[in-house]
Amino acid sequence: MAEPTPRDTLLDHAYEIADKYGLAALSVRGLASDCNVSVGTIYNHFASKGELTTATTALYFKRAFYTDFCHPTKGECYLDFCKRMFDSMEKTIHHFREHWLKDSEALPTAEKTIARFREEKQFNHICEGMIIIFKNDPSIRHNLPSHVTAEAVSKFTLRNIIAELRSEQPDCSLLFTMLERTLYEQ
C-alpha cells in the first residue's frame, strides 16, 4: 500500500476535526495548529478554506458510501441492495447533518453549497452502481415494458430514496413494495 501523501495526512486530520466538532469548526489555522505545521503548508495543498471543506466533505462521503454500500454483496438482488442502501444512507446522512453540519449557519453559503454538491456527486456515483446491479440481477422479470430500463428504474428509485431521506420520518416501504411487485415474479 502506498504511503499517505502530506495532503492525505492533512485531510485525515481535517476529517477528524469535522467529525468531532462539525465542518463549521474546520479552519486553516486550526488544522495547521493541530498538525503542527505552518498555515502556508496547508495552503500549499488547499488553495482556500472552501477547497479544504470540499475535500473533507468528499472524504466523508467516500468513506461512508463506498464502505457501507458501494460494494454489493455477492448474489444480492437489486431490491435487497436498495433496502440495505436506504438503511445505510439514512444513518450516513443523519450523521452528516447532525454532526458535520451542526452550527452550519456559521458556514458561508458557498461552503454549504459545495458540501451539498459533493453529496449530490456521490448520489450520481451510487446511481451508476445501481444500474449495474439491476442489469446483473437474474431475478428481474425479462418481460418488463421497454421504458422500464435499468437506468430509469435506478434514477426513479434513488430520487425517491433521497426524497424520503429529506422527510421528517423516512420510510421507503411503499417504494420497495412497488419495486418488488413490478420487477419480480410473484
Please state what every model-predicted region is.
Residues 3-15, 31, 52, 56-60, ...:
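Generic hydrophobic, amphipathic alpha-helix propensity
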Residues 9, 17-51, 55:
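Helix-turn-helix
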Residues 92-95, 110-140, 147-155, 162:
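Amphipathic alpha-helical packing segments from all-alpha helical-bundle domains
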Residues 59, 63, 88-96, 160-163, ...:
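Phosphate/oxyanion-binding loops and surfaces in catalytic or ligand/nucleic-acid-binding neighborhoods
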Residues 80-117:
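Amphipathic alpha-helical segments used for helix-helix packing
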Residues 55, 69-95, 150-153:
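Hydrophobic alpha-helical connector segments
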Residues 13-21, 63, 67, 71, ...:
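Solvent-exposed, amphipathic alpha-helical segments
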Residues 133, 177-186:
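C-terminal alpha-helix
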